Amino acid sequence: MVQQNIDKIISNYLTKNIVFSEENLLATKLSLLDTLGCIYNASTYEDPMRFATRGEYGSNTNPFLVIKDIQSSTEIARYFSILTRWFDYNDTFLAKEWAHPSDNIGTAFGYFFNHKDKNLSEFLQSIIQMYEIQGCLALGTSLNEKGYDHVFYVKLASGVVSVSYTHLTLPTKRSV
């Protein structure tokens, strides 16, 4: 995808008031349920828990209670992404690049866990936006073919959507 002003295109997309269809929301809810299942299943094994927590958060058997002890949104995102990725192999197959939806949902968990004023609808919308941005970028360009890590699209999509939920001005959001 050769596109000038991609930052403006993405920020304009994120500032539009889009009402997602029931089909979009259902697909996102199913993706979220799959993610929760992956997290729970991975938490029953010692290796993924040790890796996800870096051995710092004890032996709590409920993976969703562990995050009470994690202070950073980034660490919460890492924790959930690792546990999900342990079982999630749902890479995209239509794009020129593969992607891991679990990484986007991990970021959403990290952001929304620390922003209790947000609601489930905003959480689901953020996941859809992350998927759409990442998917559109991956449809046109393969970073791996150019020698870059495909995770850049994950980070870009997750980062810009998280920033879009802040109270910063549009020019400030674009500069972040």
Region locations from a protein language model:
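N-terminal core-entry segment
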Residues: 1-168, 173
